[in-house]
Structures are given as structure tokens and as C-alpha cells.
């Protein structure tokens, strides 16, 4: 998801999206620990997406 798509959302939508992405990050980290994750780069991409969402939330305040 690009930043332009993220900044169009409301703060409530962003908070819900942030919570969803953090849960997904947690599950990906667990899969990495148990050697079930085929592509570890997914974690890096997800962290960047979480950072974009946090930036959009901070910018809207």
C-alpha cells in the first residue's frame, strides 16, 4: 500500500489498519522462528508499511 493511499484514510481507519498489520507482523515473526516462513523479506516490507501508517497518523494530528 502506497503512502498516497494511506493518507486518504481517516484516523480511525488507520488505527484499525495499524492494529491489523501489527498482528500480521507478530504471526510472521512466529513463523520465522519456527522456520515456516518462506520469504523473510515479508517482515521488512510489513515493518515499512507500519511505519508509513504511523507517519500518516502523526501527520494528521
From Swiss-Prot:
Matching SUPFAM superfamilies: Ribosomal protein L29 (L29p)
Superkingdom of origin: Bacteria
GO cellular component, one term: ribosome
UniProtKB keywords: Ribonucleoprotein, Ribosomal protein
PROSITE patterns noted in UniProt: RIBOSOMAL_L29
GO BP field: translation
One Pfam family it belongs to: Ribosomal_L29
Annotated Gene3D superfamilies: 1.10.287.310
GO MF annotations, alphabetized: structural constituent of ribosome
Cell membrane as UniProt keyword: no
Keyword Ribosomal protein: yes
Family stated for the protein in its record: Belongs to the universal ribosomal protein uL29 family.
Protein's name in the database: Large ribosomal subunit protein uL29
Source organism of the structure: Campylobacter curvus (strain 525.92)
Higher taxonomy: Bacteria, Pseudomonadati, Campylobacterota, Epsilonproteobacteria, Campylobacterales
Amino acid at each position: 500500500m502506497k503512502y498516497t493511499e494511506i493518507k486518504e484514510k481517516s484516523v480511525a481507519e488507520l488505527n484499525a489498519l495499524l492494529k491489523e498489520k501489527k498482528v500480521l507482523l507478530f504471526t510472521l515473526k512466529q513463523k520465522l522462528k519456527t522456520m515456516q516462513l518462506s520469504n523473510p523479506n515479508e517482515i521488512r516490507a510489513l515493518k515499512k508499511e507500519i511505519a508509513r501508517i504511523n507517519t500518516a497518523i502523526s501527520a494528521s494530528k
